[in-house]
Amino acid sequence: MLDLMRLFCGEFTEIKSFISNDFWNHDVEDNAYALMKDKEGRVAMLNSSATQWQHKFNLDISLSEGHIELHGILSGSKSYGEERITIGVKTAENKNGLMETRTIKFLEDNSWRDEIVEFASAIINDTPVESGTSNDALETMKLVFGIYFSDDIWRNKYNIKV
C-alpha cells in the first residue's frame, strides 16, 4: 500500500502515527495509523490492522475533478475481495456533489506475468527496470521506519534509533 501511495504522491516529508499492540501484546503492532504529507501538501492516510478480522485492500484517491477507488486484490486466498477500480468524475450537471462513476472489475491477475516480462526485457535489452526498483523498495522501507519512528510511545518502548 505504501509503495502505491509513494507512486501517486512521491516522497512524504511529514509523518504522524499511532502504533499499538494492545490486543496481543507482542513486539509487533496490532494496528498502525499513519498520516503522511508530501512537499506539495497532499495528505495520505494508512490504517493497517490485524484486529479488523477481515482482509481488506482499499485505496481512495481524492482529486480536484473526481476520485479513484481501488478495492480488493486478486490473491491466491481470494480473501481480499473482488478487485475493482471505481472512477468518479465531476461534471457540470452534478452540482450536488454526485459524480458520474464507472466501475471496472478485474477477473484475471496478470501482475506477475507483466512484472516478469518487464524484468526479463530489462535484462535482455540491458535497460533499467522502470517500476518496482530496489531503490523503490528501499524508500518504501524508509517510510515504514518513519511511521514506526514518529510514534513517540512506540519509538521509546522499543528503543528505535535513527
Name these PLM-found stretches.
Residues 39, 119-162:
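C-terminal helix-rich "cap/oligomerization" subdomain common to oxidoreductases
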Residues 1-21, 34-42:
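Oxidoreductase and adenylate-handling cofactor-binding alpha/beta cores
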Residues 24-29, 39-115, 130-133:
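NAD(P)-dinucleotide binding in Rossmann-like oxidoreductases
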Residues 2, 28-32, 134, 141:
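Conserved glycosyltransferase catalytic-site signature
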Residues 1-2, 113-117, 141-144:
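A general structural signal for well-ordered alpha-helical segments in protein cores
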Residues 5, 102, 127:
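Short, flexible active-site loop motifs that bind/organize anionic cofactors or intermediates
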Residues 10-17, 43, 66, 128, ...:
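Generic structural signal for secondary-structure transition and capping sites
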